[in-house]
Amino acid sequence: MQKWNRHSSLAASAMVALLVTGCGGGGGGGSPTGQTYSATCADGSGKTSTVSAADAAAQCPTATYSAICADQSTVTSNTSQAAANAKCTPGIVAKVVASTYTGEKLAAFNQLNADRAQCGFGQLQQNAKLDVAAQGHADWLAANPFLAASHVQDPSTGKGVVTGVQRQDRLQNAGYIPTPWVNYLGTFSSTEVIGVPAWGTALSCKYCANNASFGNTELSVGNGVRQLYATVYHLVDILKGERDVGFGAAIADSSIIGVHTRYIKKVVIDPATAQGWVRQSIPSDTILTFPCQGITNTTPVFRGEDPEPFPSRGSKEYGQPVYVMGADGTTVTINAASSSITPLGGSPVATTVFNSAVDPLPPTDGRNVKNNQVFLVPTQRLLDNTTYTVVLNGTNTGMVTNANPSGAYSRTFTFSTLTPTTF
């Protein structure tokens, strides 16, 4: 798998443009020089005045910025989109309209939303325009299977229908964000995650040594979601606070891929938040985890991802990461000495803490983990069909109070793995 910038935010604002024009002849009233002052307003309309440029600008309609909060309430501001967004209190989406998906897409959508809701990340709403963008990219990847999980549609391959070279292009072409960017007063954010859930008997990746337990071929979109859970960067993306989502899935032509069955299925998930909608968020004194209490059927093997968070790992198998997230702007830590992941009736597994301090991606790379994101990662494969108890101890700057000056937190919960051959 490969991933794109973890958060892409674009904004544009229209400015009032003033134009002074000279007029011939004399006359009373208005400008003593006969000048006409023009103003181009933020909404594209024009106003004129014979008094002054300020008077022309004052005739422009007042812009109103609106935002739809996570609780579905609407707030407005005459100042800016950011000011409108700031009026929303932190919150998550508890319920969405039933999707129109069928088959494996429906199962995967329901699974993702159920898991997000169970762990407190909030649900995503199906968006038909994002479906178009995601399906278009899945189809292009299926026509270009050896590009694995590229986020760029290269027209020079001559294969498949190019629906947008970059992710932003695909969202624009699908109508999710404006084209062109004229008088665009808001912001949008989006992430694209791509899963390749097929493995088959011809395992050809460096992570596949000793992975016979992956079984033969598993092509479901739901398995693609589960494999995205067993990652670091992609797990962050699939649990981000976006409002909408689109699913795409396609199977490559077997005559192209030959025996390399790991390239056969492409699953594209496009979470995003459109202009005028506010992303889901949590209060500063809150932490969320994934897995969380009661999550089942997680993949016992960390299968690697691109970019690779553990460059020195080589082909060594790791286990399902445990993700801890605080609110934006906070710093969250895990105390490795007092945190553990333990199988029922067994001993704690070896783990490592992954955070922004050890992330191999530089701070300038938008895909890197942030200070409010930290992982406890098993440095060995977890057992199939096994219940694990997770004990987490650490700190969260958003939880600092007089009674809790260090911002300490403690969490204990259980989750379980599945047997990969029974996906």
Go through each PLM region and give its residues:
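A signal for long, low-complexity, Ser/Thr/Asn-enriched, surface-exposed stalk/shaft
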Residues: 52, 60, 78-81, 85
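Functional surface patches built around histidine and acidic residues
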Residues: 34, 64, 81-340, 369, ...
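Bacterial Sec-dependent N-terminal signal peptides
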Residues: 12-43, 64, 74-76, 91-95
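Acidic, low-complexity Ser/Thr/Gly/Pro-rich repeat segments typical of extracellular/periplasmic
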Residues: 309-423
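Secreted, short cysteine-rich peptides and small extracellular cysteine-rich domains stabilized by multiple disulfide
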Residues: 56-59, 68
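Bacterial N-terminal signal peptides that target proteins for export
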Residues: 2-12
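A short, exposed loop/beta-hairpin motif centered on an aromatic-Gly-Thr core
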Residues: 44-51, 72-79
